[in-house]
Amino acid sequence: MPINRIAIGTPGEASRPDAIRAAFAEFFSMVIFVFAGQGSGMAYGKLTGDGPATPAGLVAASLSHAFALFVAVSVGANVSGGHVNPAVTFGAFIGGNITLLRAILYWIAQLLGAVVACLLLKVSTGGMETAAFSLSYGVTPWNAVVFEIVMTFGLVYTVYATAVDPKKGDIGIIAPLAIGLIVGANILVGGAFDGASMNPAVSFGPAVVSWIWTNHWVYWVGPFIGAAIAAIVYDTIFIGSNGHEPLPSNDF
């Protein structure tokens, strides 16, 4: 079970050069992701005069977040693992793939990156507000929690299958693309209901800059639960001592 591999970390680990570099990688990847993802929504709102939400707007949000996350994960992968998401980091911690001390360092970097990206957007757009995540009419907080659990489960399961699994073989090279695509697909599913965050930092940045915290807890509880379930399920079934055998590379 992954719970047996959970580690706090060693004294001084957070100050090691490799850990500091990894934190910077997470920070800059998050700035790239949030600036492009949140910024695309602001640009769409400006072009449409902040009119009502439309299917075209949802598709645009899906594509922009998918492309931006693909890039953000790719540029950080060789330094920090390209988590770009506190929930992904939590899933890696639950699976014993990162220590708690390094996870905390990642969380700080990710949250700061999201806030900086939103501040940059506010300044560069002449004071436009970054849109805080919110629930649509008729959607209760617990509806949204379930949405976030399921969507984040799919995301972190994809991360484990394409990036964490030591038996992933050649399919590992498509990890950033697969991660971006599952986020884009989930936005098409949940965007009209709760904004489809799957990422506490993505929700935190706009909340800080706009200072709107209504139901903000939803975007932490749901993703962290979904990430933990995905990590435990994938690690227990596929990475454990009696896990699967990798397919020959020519089968991909």
From Swiss-Prot:
Keywords of this entry: Acetylation, Membrane, Repeat, Stress response, Transmembrane, Transmembrane helix, Transport, Vacuole
Induction: By dehydration. Not affected by water stress.
Pfam families per UniProt: MIP
Membrane topology: Multi-pass membrane protein
Gene3D superfamilies: Glycerol uptake facilitator protein
Functional note: Potential aquaporin, which may facilitate the transport of water and small neutral solutes across cell membranes.
InterPro entries: Aquaporin-like (IPR023271), Aquaporin_transptr (IPR034294), MIP (IPR000425), MIP_CS (IPR022357)
Subunit structure: Interacts with cucumber mosaic virus (CMV) Protein 1a.
Protein's organism: Arabidopsis thaliana (Mouse-ear cress)
N-acetylmethionine: modified positions: M1
Domain remark text: Aquaporins contain two tandem repeats each containing three membrane-spanning domains and a pore-forming loop with the signature motif Asn-Pro-Ala (NPA).
Any one GO MF annotation of this record: urea transmembrane transporter activity
TM segment ranges: 23-43, 56-76, 115-135, 144-164, 171-191, 220-240
Family: Belongs to the MIP/aquaporin (TC 1.A.8) family. TIP (TC 1.A.8.10) subfamily.
Cellular localization per UniProt: Vacuole membrane
Intervals, Cytoplasmic compartment: 1-22, 77-114, 165-170, 241-252
Motif segment (NPA 2): 199-201
Protein name: Aquaporin TIP1-3
Vacuolar membrane side: 44-55, 136-143, 192-219
PANTHER family registered for this protein in UniProt: AQUAPORIN TIP1-3, AQUAPORIN-8
GO CC field: vacuolar membrane
Ranges spanned by the short sequence motif NPA 1, renumbered to the chain: 85-87
Keyword Membrane: yes
UniProt key word Transmembrane: yes
GO biological process: urea transport; water transport
